[in-house]
């Protein structure tokens, strides 16, 4: 992912509608970024805002969270917005924890809910 800043977008199943609405409402700010997203989340974002530059990776449970983690560790992802569903058990919970751990280790900005994402996005430089 050469050139430009990269933002990762992920949403658990129960939060995908929220992520689509977030993308639609913030398309002007998001249009300044290269976006990587897990498969289904990326599809929902593109449906909501087809003009965004979104690269879809694998679905989270099929390795997408790990792909984004790898991009964080190589410095290719500059910020993470991850709408987490804390009320639904996730079979790939260990992948989610590893992803969050990498965002912390590599000290990139990370929002885990809509309220934080709304505050964070305008402060980021694309």
Curated annotation (Swiss-Prot):
Keywords: Lyase. Gene3D superfamilies: Methylglyoxal synthase-like domain. The keyword Lyase applies. InterPro entries: Methylgl_synth (IPR004363), Methylglyoxal_synth_AS (IPR018148), MGS-like_dom (IPR011607), MGS-like_dom_sf (IPR036914). It comes from Rhizobium etli (strain CIAT 652). Residues 1-126 form the MGS-like domain. It comes from the Bacteria. GO terms for molecular function: methylglyoxal synthase activity. The keyword Lyase applies. This is Methylglyoxal synthase.
